[in-house]
Amino acid sequence: MWRQSRWNEPLITEMSRRGRRGALPPRPDEKVVKEVGPLKLPQSLARGSPPSLPEVSEVEVVRHYTRLSQMAYGVDNGPVPLGSCTMKYNPRVAARLAFDPRLETLHPLQDDETVQGVLEAIYMVQEWLRHITGMDACTVHPAAGSQGELAGVLMIKRFHEMRGDLDKRRVIIVPDSAHGTNPASAAMGGFQVVEVPTGDDGNVDMEALKAAVGGDTAGLMITNPSTLGLFEENILEISRLVHEAGGLLYYDGANLNGIIGRARPGDMEFDIAHVNLHKTFSVPHGGGGPGSGPVCVKRVEVVDGVTLEDLLPGPRVVYSREEGLYRVRPPGRWSVGRLRAWIANTLAVLWAYAYILAMGPQGLRLAGEVSVVNTNYFIRLMEGHWGYSLPYAPSRPRKHEVVLSAKPLKRETGATAEDVAKGLLDAGLYAPTIYFPLIVEEALMIEFTESETKENIEAYAARLKEIAEEARRDPSTPRKWPRNTTSARVDNVRANHPRTVTPTWRVEVLRRQGKLGPLR
């Protein structure tokens, strides 16, 4: 039976003891001091007090982080079928390039002429993504998918602003099966969000969409395949409706892995698309980073020869044919501007560069196809099993992911989707995304990438079936899960409440000092 390590591990700051050191650098040789004189540090560079860093030995640091790793779980431990996250294997061949010491020592302010290799790699990723998505221009500037979304929304805003109709174009339409950050990005951009429902067939309800589209429509944001794992069959008709109304069509690339090499957003007539390098292109992610959300566009004319390409955030890497050099081009007059410091999350871009080179066009297409096969094999394993159902067009094949519902299980036993997730954890299996999308009650959003074996998928399905049977035999059992993990079931309210949530050591210090005021 699986058991996860349970170390009574303190924070590394709590391990600190005054005077303890990991290494003691030698004092400078007296002959050297005599030759060069004493070190004279400008007062403006001197600290007023020592840095607040833990004082620990090297062996304590190594043991501390080793023990923490034993209480964690990631794709190197086993499958992580988090729906809409595409947690695929991170090839070590890509890591060899991304962590090359010659790249780690570069500085973003170096002259372009001295970093031509890195700039070429960034430029090539832009070009490859442009072809993969079927678009005309691309930037790798955004640091995350959500930042790529915001860039797209700001471009839609600038588009209508330059055309002089922003005052009436105040609505962005978002299907209820879209990626979760779409409505947030639209709202951050200053737009009103109008939601359109999903029909029983898993497609956007076209009658509802026709009623929503009008003279106030600035654009539509959609994920295809949707968060249900279904390909939007009416995408060309949706595109026609939005464009005829004067709006722009935005593609959320969160689920690109399900169609890569088979279909392209540009061919679906999208105007703007973002891609997640940390999903489709194998860059490691989780815990907040590193992410990369490149944005690609069609050269749709805005006004007087200005196109959507001119609106892209930056800086961007371009190739100067006259000089035969790659250059960093700062944001131009019409650009929505900088979204972050420097060019991009360069490490993530270089990782994707190595992955795309290693896979090639055929390999990328095969990866998408295998992810689809894995998902549908899992569906077949779960088909008709008591406790779970497949909402929305159960006879339609899914793409990269599937959303099961534990509603029948809850109705009969009281066990919820959260209980199912805890039961998976208790068996050493990573839990899926739960309670999303919101249109599925007791949702279990499961995505097996191309990395997973037939045996891993079968083991996951078998455990889901065991959970249902255990809940039927004794409805109180699921509430006791997990028992074999490092941490037992947490109090979600306390863990997330503004009065108690403590995401960083800095917040912990402020709490101990009583400097965090009451919730207002």
From Swiss-Prot:
One GO CC annotation: cytosol
One Pfam family hit: GcvP2_C
Keywords from the named record: Oxidoreductase, Pyridoxal phosphate
Gene Ontology MF: a single term: glycine binding
Enzyme class, spelled out: oxidoreductase
The protein's role, per its UniProt record: The glycine cleavage system catalyzes the degradation of glycine. The P protein binds the alpha-amino group of glycine through its pyridoxal phosphate cofactor; CO(2) is released and the remaining methylamine moiety is then transferred to the lipoamide cofactor of the H protein.
Family, similarity comment: Belongs to the GcvP family. C-terminal subunit subfamily.
Protein's name according to its UniProt entry: Probable glycine dehydrogenase (decarboxylating) subunit 2
Native source organism of the sequence: Aeropyrum pernix (strain ATCC 700893 / DSM 11879 / JCM 9820 / NBRC 100138 / K1)
Underlying gene: gcvPB
